[in-house]
A protein has these predicted regions:
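Conserved alpha/beta-domain cores
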Residues: 1-189
Length: 189
């Protein structure tokens, strides 16, 4: 038993989620014991942001865990996570997308990705501008990458107290998502 009631905390969060929403439990910096407790309660999707920590956890925890890589990913680190990562949640360049495709192919896998948008008005955030993302999709090179599947978009709102600013940024992201889905992914769910 750990000093944190993982099961209680997990169930409190799960009770608040709408139908159809899957929780990605952020496990970075948390010991394997906490992850195992969440796993024992039925949680199967976990998010990590450091490849060394992820490698250790993959080796010691159940092999049916679905691992997501969250946060900024350097191109030279893709080869270390490609054997076991299910999704990369922050793809911020065509160069990174190419490397993910290359490393996924080397591991005979398809890796899901989310294209990261930089909408927040903070220099500390990564991502593609809407115009850059639109251009990446329009150019179509991603369609020739059989080992990568663009599963959606992600963005981080500005870390501010101004709820109106956050709403505006989320509205921009939602509107762009609708545009992307209707223009490039009409045959997908």
């Amino acid at each position: 038993m750990t000093d944190v009631d993982v099961a209680k905390n997990l169930h409190q969060v799960l009770e608040c989620l709408p139908d159809g929403v899957r929780l990605v439990a952020i496990s970075k910096y948390h010991p394997a014991e906490y992850i195992q407790e969440a796993y024992d309660e039925g949680q199967r999707v976990f998010g990590e942001s450091h490849e060394q920590e992820l490698k250790v956890k993959v080796a010691t925890l159940p092999n049916d865990i679905e691992w997501h890589f969250i946060g900024h990913l350097q191109t030279n680190k893709v080869k270390y996570i490609a054997p076991y990562i299910s999704m990369i949640e922050a793809v911020d360049s065509l160069r990174l997308l190419r490397e993910i495709d290359k490393q996924a192919a080397r591991n005979n896998r398809v890796i899901d990705v989310l294209l990261e948008l930089h909408i927040a008005q903070e220099a500390t955030k990564y991502g593609l501008t809407i115009d850059q993302c639109r251009q990446l999709l329009e150019d179509g090179e991603w369609r020739k990458m059989p080992n990568v599947r663009i599963a959606g978009l992600m963005m981080m709102a500005s870390n501010v107290d101004d709820e109106e600013q956050i709403r505006r940024e989320m509205t921009i992201a939602a509107d762009f998502f609708d545009e992307v889905k209707s223009k490039y992914f009409t045959d997908d769910d």
